[in-house]
Amino acid sequence: IAYHRTPGRLPGVVFMGGFASDMTGTKAAALESFVRQRSNAFVRFDYQGHGQSSGHFRDGTIGQWSRDAVHVLDALTEGPQVLVGSSMGGWIMLLAALARPAHAAGMLGIAAAPDFTEDMLWAGFDAATRERIERDGVYEMPSDYGAPLPITRDLIHEGRSHLLMRGTIPLTCPVRLIQGMQDDEVPWDWALKLTERLQSEDVETVLIKHGDHRLSDGPDLDRLRYQLDRLLGHVEGVAT
């Protein structure tokens, strides 16, 4: 697993990226720079089959990528962490926090997409596409961001064992969710459903009326920095 770690004080921050993205993205870089100015520790990494990490993207599953995140928490961090998850990373963040609750002092979800393999991909495919996936094992899905993305039968089937939005999510740490209302990949009301599903009483959800899925332009990055700063301050206040 390729990673970049900036040493610093606690709580640390661990950034978990999206489906087929990598740790060099705009949000990861902007938040790393901000957290460094704040003197907190920061880790960003690539899941297997992503970016600079080994493996093939089409071999990946939600279980594999969540294990990658847990491994990063175990090997590269100590003490309380604020987990930041973008898109699919929001699902990975929740799974990692459930696996290592002592590490998860807070969470910041950016267009968080828990259960997206089932409720966004599979639910959005027509019968012919579903048949192709079941028969051929893969569907090359067109992407707005570059080459088609291989959506595999394993990704869909294995993802079903990690679905979180069917019941209460037993996490009690503070959570901040940021969601654009012009997001064409994650419906904005998904953030409200996640707010309801989380057991935590300390959940704040920010809807950005003109925000898209990426939330990577200047004003959006300012909002992310502001929310992360508030959350880190809150966690630091609780810890002292």
Predicted feature locations:
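The serine-hydrolase catalytic nucleophile loop
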Residues: 19-32, 189
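Short alpha-helix in the alpha/beta-hydrolase fold that links the catalytic acid
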Residues: 28, 173, 187-196, 220
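Conserved alpha/beta-hydrolase
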Residues: 32-54
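Alpha/beta-hydrolase active-site loop
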Residues: 59-75
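Hydrolase active-site cap/lid region
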Residues: 103-150
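Short beta-strand/loop motif that positions the catalytic acidic residue
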Residues: 170-171, 177-179, 183
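Acidic catalytic loop of the alpha/beta-hydrolase fold
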Residues: 182-186, 213-214
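Catalytic histidine-centered segment of alpha/beta-hydrolase-like enzymes
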Residues: 211-223
